[in-house]
Amino acid sequence: VNPFDEIEWIISRIKIKNINGDILFDQDIEHPVFWDEMAVRTCAEKYMKSDLGNLPHNGERSVKDVIHRVSFSITKRGKDLGYLDEKGSKILYDELCWLLLHQFAAFNSPVFVNWWLYDVYGFKGNSKTKRWAIKNRDAEVYQQQFEYENAQGAACFITEVEDELIDGENGIYDWVNTVM
């Protein structure tokens, strides 16, 4: 059973204003009936794409669009790299959709913001950006042609191998104590 077909959907008008009262966002958004207003507003404002020029219906207007984009892209990548067959890909897609729809799991913002505009909508981004990606299961790397070909999925990075959470010379906790 398709996870999107198992639940009831409604459409709500989402209007977001800035401090001065100027309207930043004003759209009808389709979402699960059990999502609260904050979840719908966050998804609409932060993660729905509307400015790429080649999106259906002038942009994403449903939580389905966002969840499909992310879940499809993860399973496509797993299949392309040889980790999943057709059956495993379908199972993982359905499971990811269900978990995200029912809010049992959520990815960090870069996943929802960046993944995978290239795979689903063909959005390439800046071709001058030089990025490297894994080509296959043997961890061969290649230089991407387009910015969103393998989009960034994390916002924070450990700065060096010796970086760690514990106290000590390279510990993050130690650093926090010195700046507070």
Where are these regions (language model features)?
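Extended catalytic cores of very large enzyme megasubunits
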Residues: V1-M180
